[in-house]
């Protein structure tokens, strides 16, 4: 879920913390990627037509593999160095959020059945996306794919985004690539959004600088965590009626959730029953993450025959296109090996600015990119069948 309303809050109050970057400007950058979140997105949208997903001859869904293959190839061709991190066990405090998601999925499944019976194709397409489940097998298949492509792979002990943030803080990577803003709540120095967006969307990468976020909002790291909890996070409920703007105002006035509870009208703004905001705060401050000491990152040439065995023989991908992907990646490795980062070659980044009542781009306006990932079909390796969810 991330943090509700955090992006808009930063645009309005800390615009200097956000830069629009070109995808190509990440040449030779190491980037930790929350793979589990992107698998879910690929399962929802890649190759989908109505409620039909891409499958192999055995009826196994392959949307996640096509999506990850396309995006990984694009990054490697651009000289970007991805590291994929996968979720481990969920924290106990996330149990409530996971239960809510399960309930919503079951509601969507019931509504989907009714929409099918009514012949409402628009509702069928919308609801089928809400029933998507990412299994352990899906994650393991993407791990195998990434390894065969020569990309470093890690399984976090708990939340992937927390371990990604730890890698960034340790200086192992330049940024964390994810769409979930709570990566900043884990104090990742840089967060990159849209890095995994398809090329067809032509979206600029939005890079968020953690230190500039704190400076722009006028908060300490501890206050930023409390504000995010008030906005709404995955680990606990929040106070109904208090949105992001009010959350920022209250934290700046009182300094902590404890002080806020002493001052606000709790009849008008009743806190949740048994509200464990302190537990959520501790999870953000001291999450369970992988040990970053002694990690040696390396990117290898793709294992072409291994990819043929896995993607072509097992998953029925098109062999010619898989070999073409391998050729592109190998060529890119040879071409980028001697290149150094020259940020001036790409020009200065665009700084996001804010004015009262509207938002604008200070140096130049990037394309709006209104069509989200769910509105575009990804082009790439073909050779699939379609099956209903």
UniProtKB/Swiss-Prot annotation:
For this protein, what post-translational modification is recorded in UniProt?
A: Phosphorylated. Phosphorylation upon DNA damage induces relocalization to the nuclear plasma.
Binding, Mg(2+) 2 = 180, 182, 234
Q: Where is this region: Disordered?
A: 356-389
Tell me where in or outside the cell this protein is found.
Answer: Nucleus, Nucleolus; Nucleus, Nucleoplasm; Mitochondrion
Task: Give the SMART domains listed for this entry.
Answer: 53EXOc, HhH2, XPGI, XPGN
User: What does the entry list as the binding residues for DNA?
Assistant: 71, 159, 232, 234
The UniProt keywords, alphabetically, are: DNA damage, DNA repair, DNA replication, Endonuclease, Exonuclease, Hydrolase, Magnesium, Metal-binding, Mitochondrion, Nuclease, Nucleus, Phosphoprotein
- One Pfam family cited in the UniProt record for this chain: XPG_I
What is the role of the protein in this entry? Structure-specific nuclease with 5'-flap endonuclease and 5'-3' exonuclease activities involved in DNA replication and repair. During DNA replication, cleaves the 5'-overhanging flap structure that is generated by displacement synthesis when DNA polymerase encounters the 5'-end of a downstream Okazaki fragment. It enters the flap from the 5'-end and then tracks to cleave the flap base, leaving a nick for ligation. Also involved in the long patch base excision repair (LP-BER) pathway, by cleaving within the apurinic/apyrimidinic (AP) site-terminated flap.
- Family (UniProt): Belongs to the XPG/RAD2 endonuclease family. FEN1 subfamily.
| Protein name in UniProt | Flap endonuclease 1
């Amino acid at each position: 879920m991330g943090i509700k309303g955090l992006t808009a809050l930063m645009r309005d109050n800390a615009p200097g913390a956000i830069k629009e970057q070109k995808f190509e400007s990440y040449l030779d950058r190491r980037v930790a990627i929350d793979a589990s979140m992107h698998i879910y997105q690929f399962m929802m949208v890649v190759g989908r037509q109505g409620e039909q997903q891409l499958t192999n001859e055995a009826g196994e869904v392959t949307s996640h593999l096509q999506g990850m293959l396309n995006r990984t190839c694009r990054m490697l061709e651009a000289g970007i160095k991805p590291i994929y991190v996968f979720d481990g066990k969920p924290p106990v405090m996330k149990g409530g959020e996971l239960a809510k998601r399960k309930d919503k999925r079951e509601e969507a499944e019931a509504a989907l059945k009714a929409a099918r019976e009514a012949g409402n194709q628009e509702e069928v397409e919308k609801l089928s996306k809400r029933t998507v489940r990412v299994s352990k097998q899906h994650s393991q298949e993407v791990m195998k794919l990434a390894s065969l492509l020569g990309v470093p792979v890690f399984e976090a002990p708990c939340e992937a985004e927390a371990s990604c943030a730890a890698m960034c803080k340790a200086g192992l990577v330049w940024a964390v690539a994810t769409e979930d803003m709570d990566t900043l709540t884990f104090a990742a120095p840089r967060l990159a959004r849209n890095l995994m967006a398809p090329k067809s969307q032509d979206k600029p990468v939005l890079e968020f600088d953690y230190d500039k976020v704190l400076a722009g909002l006028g908060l300490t790291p501890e206050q930023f965590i409390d504000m995010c909890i008030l906005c709404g996070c995955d680990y606990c409920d929040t106070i109904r009626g208090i949105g992001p703007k009010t959350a920022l105002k209250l934290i700046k006035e009182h300094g902590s959730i404890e002080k806020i509870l002493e001052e606000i009208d709790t009849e008008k703004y009743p806190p949740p029953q048994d509200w464990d905001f302190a537990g959520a705060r501790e999870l953000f401050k001291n999450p369970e993450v992988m040990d970053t000491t002694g990690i040696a990152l390396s990117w290898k040439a793709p294992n072409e025959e291994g990819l043929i065995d896995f993607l072509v023989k097992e998953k029925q991908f098109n062999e010619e296109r898989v070999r073409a992907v391998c050729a592109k990646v190998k060529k890119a490795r040879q071409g980028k090996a001697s290149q150094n980062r020259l940020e001036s070659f790409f020009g200065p980044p665009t700084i996001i600015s804010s004015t009262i009542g509207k938002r604008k781009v200070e140096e130049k306006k990037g394309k709006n990119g209104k069509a989200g990932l769910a509105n575009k079909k990804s082009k790439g390796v073909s050779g699939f069948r379609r099956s209903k969810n």
